[in-house]
Amino acid sequence: YSGYAGGKTKNPTYYQVITGKTGHAETVEVIYDPEVIDFATLIEVFFDSHDPTLLNQQGPDRGTQYRSVAFYQNESEKKIIEDHISKLTKEKTYSKKIVTEVKPLSKFYYAENYHQDYEKNNPNDLYILNVSKPRLNKFKVTSPELLKKEQH
């Protein structure tokens, strides 16, 4: 699901979040079966799916609401995230410093309905065409085994 997390404003709307004053980041909630995929793999996908060295920016979008942030629900998840960042840093995967925030998830707020399934419902949107599709196509090449057969 698309939504917002990491800020102070209760029940934020998209128009509040894009001001950058709520403290929330645009986020997704991932519901998964740990018997099928583990949290560590999801973290690998997270880091492979965006540029974690960009401060307050993803694609053409700028502002604190577009920051790279990984949320955890327990100390084990926190350690997995921190260990992965350490591994990427040690291996010099990126030429710049990783700026991803690692924060406890206090509350996830669902975004408005028109933000859900955005790619499917807006296939000709310029962000979808210029940012999302290229990321997905790269992922299909690098990690095809992680895609559901009925998706994309």
Residue locations for each model-derived region?
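Flexible coil/turn and secondary-structure edge motifs
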Residues: Y1-H152
